[in-house]
Amino acid sequence: MNLTPREKDKLLVSLAAIVARGRLERGVKLNHPEAIALITDYVVEGARDGRSVADLMQAGAQVVRAEQCMPGIPEMIHDVQVEATFPDGTKLVTVHHPIR
């Protein structure tokens, strides 16, 4: 299987999100990369499902709660920017203050 660098990046984010979900299920608090991966994966999958940029900007801020993260992590993440493929092309989605 020949994957482009972009496809490899998408797979790594998806795998990191799977690991993060498993840790949440076990009650383990998320670190910085895990929280980013969950939000990013949510936006990418939502785009593939045909949701709007505005919808994903709002909904992306509800994926991870502050109490699910290690101390200090919510304050470290101000914005998450995701380049996602929508039915009408690739767009940049910015989730402001993603962990509340």
Swiss-Prot record:
Cell compartments where the protein resides: Cytoplasm
Family annotation (SUPFAM superfamilies): Urease, gamma-subunit
Transmembrane segments: none
GO cellular component, one term: cytoplasm
InterPro entries linked: Urease_gamma (IPR012010), Urease_gamma/gamma-beta_su (IPR002026), Urease_gamma_sf (IPR036463), Urease_subunit (IPR050069)
Pathway the protein acts in: Nitrogen metabolism; urea degradation; CO(2) and NH(3) from urea (urease route): step 1/1
UniProt GO MF annotations: nickel cation binding; urease activity
Enzyme Commission designation: 3.5.1.5
Keyword line: Cytoplasm, Hydrolase
Disulfide bonds: none
Enzyme class: hydrolase
GO biological process, one term: urea catabolic process
Family matches, as Pfam families: Urease_gamma
Subunit note: Heterotrimer of UreA (gamma), UreB (beta) and UreC (alpha) subunits. Three heterotrimers associate to form the active enzyme.
Similarity section: Belongs to the urease gamma subunit family.
Protein name (database record): Urease subunit gamma
Gene label: ureA
